[in-house]
Design a protein with these regions (language model features):
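Long, low-complexity N-terminal extensions
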Residues: 2-225
């Protein structure tokens, strides 16, 4: 083999080795023990430790609810025991009469979600779901962003039908008729799945407060058809 051909072969092998190395390096953050998947699991665990939120589809829309708990011995907020759907900076974000979000977990991350969603006009439920889903996916798969440590429930009647969606730190999206996220959510979700029936608003409010643990301070908002 001539020196020229030998050099060309060595160059090809060198480039092939570089590509394989690049592939391995790209995969490593996702699948190594200290990589991306454990970070997703940690973000979901952090979100599950938050005070619970609930979403219920009822006969005329979607009801979103959120519980407020004092932290570090602080007193309960001034809206004790009231329906506080007008609360600024709360756990329920109204994006108009037909679209709203509720967040559990890291409230700074939920606020960041709100900044992206606020002020945008969505022509349909699908458009709103696609936009918020893309935001979660971007934070989940990119290496230069932090995974969002929040579960978000979206209630929408933009198309005339009442629909409820959950967005998780992993980037997954699920549609439900009843869902709880935050502390004790697994137990409550099982009970809701067994007992759920299409509800009136009054009954939905009662079920929501029960799912939230009959809190002293809470927030409710109705997305009506």
């Amino acid at each position: 083999m001539s020196a020229r051909r030998r050099n060309q072969r060595e160059d090809r092998e060198s480039r092939r080795g570089q590509f394989l190395s690049a592939d391995r390096n790209a995969a490593a953050p996702h699948y190594t023990p200290d990589g991306h998947v454990p970070r997703i699991q940690a973000a979901e665990a952090a979100a599950e430790r938050g005070a619970p939120i609930v979403g219920l589809v009822f006969d005329r829309g979607v009801l979103l609810g959120a519980r407020y708990d004092p932290m570090g011995g602080e007193p309960l907020p001034a809206f004790l025991g009231k329906n506080t759907s007008n609360l600024r900076g709360g756990k329920i974000l109204r994006l108009g009469p037909r679209l709203a979000l509720a967040g559990a977990g890291l409230m700074g991350d939920f606020a960041a979600v709100g900044r992206h969603m606020r002020g945008r006009r969505f022509s349909s439920t699908r458009a709103a779901v696609d936009y918020l889903g893309s935001l979660f996916w971007e934070h989940t798969v990119r290496h230069d962003t932090r995974i969002l440590g929040t579960f978000v429930l979206m209630g929408s009647t933009l198309d005339g039908d009442a629909r409820l969606f959950q967005f998780s730190p992993s980037g997954s999206i699920h549609e439900y008729v009843a869902c709880v996220r935050g502390r004790a959510s697994r137990t409550v979700n099982k009970r809701l799945a067994e007992d759920y029936r299409r509800l009136s608003l009054r009954r939905a409010e009662s079920v929501a407060l029960e799912a939230l643990g009959q809190p002293e301070a809470y927030e409710l908002f109705t997305v009506k058809t």
